[in-house]
Amino acid sequence: MRNMQEKGVSEKEILEELKKYRSLDLKYEDGNIFGSMCSNVLPITRKIVDIFLETNLGDPGLFKGTKLLEEKAVALLGSLLNNKDAYGHIVSGGTEANLMALRCIKNIWREKRRKGLSKNEHPKIIVPITAHFSFEKGREMMDLEYIYAPIKEDYTIDEKFVKDAVEDYDVDGIIGIAGTTELGTIDNIEELSKIAKENNIYIHVDAAFGGLVIPFLDDKYKKKGVNYKFDFSLGVDSITIDPHKMGHCPIPSGGILFKDIGYKRYLDVDAPYLTETRQATILGTRVGFGGACTYAVLRYLGREGQRKIVNECMENTLYLYKKLKENNFKPVIEPILNIVAIEDEDYKEVCKKLRDRGIYVSVCNCVKALRIVVMPHIKREHIDNFIEILNSIKRD
């Protein structure tokens, strides 16, 4: 149907049509989605979406209760990240969150330019080569200048390169990753923050995935030599953290937190025809259920409930890691978080063959490898099936 018809159709007819299209989609519960950082939502969130479906956080004066829930959600996330004074928003996802941090860096640079404190023609930002593609979008959109930092043998940012770059250039921002998209590695945020603070440089941490994993890891899953510290206790300026990844909330439920309310002035624009005349987020219209679900899930699960889910994912991750080694496959690294990468020279072809068999993994860019994210919907029987199919493909 490409043209809108004159007369409408019945509810039954349209719902039947929609269900046919939905049947073409993969389902998390089938256990064939191995490459996604999203998963099943908690059942309670379906009820919450229905309650808050017609709310708009972009016009908070009309939806004061919904706005209060967003603030409460930010406060709870702030408590997980060791900051009772955090300011932030529940946004569309990690991309918008990272763009907001980049906007903040750019507007601080503009202020420096006006005061004669920066000679940079564009904001200079150190970005690891493992950074999410949203940073590339930000570079193009905001005319930013990146200094791309290489990674070390452990696939984390080279802190010495960062330190040298800060000495050689007038740097406006540093990006660190707490749970890289491809391997789940954690940059040494403590060292990056030290470099940033010593040189009065803004530092942003992309913990879109790791933010709701790292604080809940039992010590037995923590690897020797990995610095798991990444939060506001280190003095970082902002953190991306996504409830619709390991926070079991519906899409879109992303999160961006800043150290305090003082950063808001670098984000606000005039919105004179709304009930609040200043707006900080990239999107204008924003769903209200993202904030409501984030608040509700954190309250519903508590630290104990979230810890249980995270550690179950880690148990299954280590089970996958063990099975891969038993079957002579080569994981790139021992898992840091619930992400496993499998070295394979023919990784793109193997990925295609897996999809032909109904198994959806993704691939890495920093190394020739298949990438698997062990989300809550992945169970051991799904892992066993995956190993069997992978063996079959490699035999062929």
Swiss-Prot record:
PTM sites of type N6-(pyridoxal phosphate)lysine: 245
Keyword Cell cycle listed: no
GO molecular function terms attached to this record: aspartate 1-decarboxylase activity; pyridoxal phosphate binding; tyrosine decarboxylase activity
Signal sequence range: none
Pfam families assigned to the protein according to its UniProt record, in alphabetical order: Pyridoxal_deC
GO biological process, one term: methanofuran biosynthetic process
pH effect on activity, per entry: Optimum pH is 7.5-8.5 for tyrosine decarboxylase activity.
Superkingdom field: Archaea
UniProt cross-references to InterPro entries, sorted A to Z: GrpII_AminoAcid_Decarb (IPR050477), MfnA (IPR020931), PyrdxlP-dep_de-COase (IPR002129), PyrdxlP-dep_Trfase (IPR015424), PyrdxlP-dep_Trfase_major (IPR015421), PyrdxlP-dep_Trfase_small (IPR015422)
Keywords of this entry: Decarboxylase, Lyase, Pyridoxal phosphate
Enzyme Commission number(s): 4.1.1.11, 4.1.1.25
Catalytic activities: L-tyrosine + H(+) = tyramine + CO2; L-aspartate + H(+) = beta-alanine + CO2
TM ranges: none
Role played: Catalyzes the decarboxylation of L-tyrosine to produce tyramine for methanofuran biosynthesis. Can also catalyze the decarboxylation of L-aspartate to produce beta-alanine for coenzyme A (CoA) biosynthesis.
Family: Belongs to the group II decarboxylase family. MfnA subfamily.
UniProt-recorded name of the protein: L-tyrosine/L-aspartate decarboxylase
Organism: Methanocaldococcus jannaschii (strain ATCC 43067 / DSM 2661 / JAL-1 / JCM 10045 / NBRC 100440) (Methanococcus jannaschii)
